[in-house]
Amino acid sequence: MKRQLLKGITPKGFKKRFNKDEDCYKYLSELKWADESFVCKRCGHTHYCKGHLPYARRCTRCKHDESPLAGTVFEKIKFSLLTAFQLIFDFCIIERRASTITLSSKYDIRQKTIWEFKHKVQQSIGCMNVEMLDNNVYLGKFIIEDNRKRHATNNIVVALEISGNGGVGRAYAEIIDCTSDKATKEFLERHCHPSTTIFISKEKENDILINGWSDVQFFANNEAVEMLNEHIAELKNWLCGNHRNCSHEHIQGYLNEYYFRFNLRKQKSIMFSTLVSHMANTSPKRTKSKS
């Protein structure tokens, strides 16, 4: 079975492609077992026959039936697979308007249930392979208050890729522990190619980067710095506007969400298929209820 990624899918095309649960099970099975990659989770056998459940596969040795949902982020969802696909599609295309309140009303599902699924999606995005930044990278930091804890703040570091012709490339952000001198350096190591030139401000806390990175320079291009500041302002407005009551432990999930869309902003047609494909091949994580 050849893996199929949907390209250029529109809301109308989505409804035509996914009209019932069976359509979703079929697509998920194609992604999960791409190129006939079935391996029984119980005994490791690689031969199968048709299972009892829709598009399930039954191991010919131990007779274990495995659903397309098993071992994926979709495992144990509290609504239909079609609804899950619809939520993910909304998540990819609606952006700012995809609040849990709006989606709860649209699909007649409890807001908490919607939030828990969205949190699973955010966690899944956080497990995606990082495409390392390899152009000039401008480093910025900002602080937002934690509305749930008095006098508490959240420290966020941003790395924005700016090409030689002044175009904005990809970017990443993480919530960090400001008390750790190594936090920013470790963030860059996770997201930037070792040969990348890092541009930083002349702040004391950036001293560790000067000695720990191959090519570090101070801000010089005012236009690039302005682009960085505009990027941070947009991110901050999104966090403080849409998710101003988000607790510290969940901010990274929203950063994952923001940068998944940002980094695919020129490839919006593949957002849905990219995300579903990843979720089909990612083990589920336990999520905490929103406090």
Descriptions of predicted regions:
Residues 1-291:
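Residue-level recognition of single "structural anchor" positions
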